[in-house]
Amino acid sequence: MLETLLSFVVATCLLALSPGPDNMYVLTQSLANGKRSALAITAGLISGCIVHTTLLAFGISAVITTNPSLFFGIKVLGALYLLYLAYAVFKSDATLEFSENAPKKNYGQLFKQGVIMNLLNPKVMLFFLALFPQFLWEPQTDTVRQFYILGVTFMVVSFIVFGIIALLGGSVSSFLNKNKHTGVFLKWLQILVFIAIAAFILVP
């Protein structure tokens, strides 16, 4: 069991560090809005994984992924939500983040945003279906408990990796905040990241 879990931790670390929509999103948010906003987003993204773990453990993920209409519907909802977020950033004032009078971030709202993004990304479901069964140490007995152990391990490791990304990006954000001209660049960077993730979800 221990050897299998250690292998799973290594695999999770490598996957979390590999360029992908989630860590790119966390990095973008940390650069644009600071480490606290990025950590709130990270907490939301990771918390959504417990739902995917539950769906996997009880066989619901397999049912969803084998239903083309339902699976496609989730993909469309996820893409539309991301495009809505891109539009919200587009409508925002690019200079707000650099003003001393800028409104405080609603971290609860950012957390919820991360959760919704995770839940409406069916590729996370496919990822769990492909990865987790490979690391069951007793495939014939009590797989529900094993899936939850793997799920919690995945969440902890991913949060640590994404948290480091958020902190590193946040330290750069402090420097960027001194230059008002970066506001427009970061605004459009966020928009492009949202659109790119939406496209990633829709592509088969």
Kindly give the residue locations of the regions a language model identified.
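Juxtamembrane helix-boundary/capping and inter-helix hinge elements in multi-pass membrane proteins
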Residues: 30-37, 105, 177-181
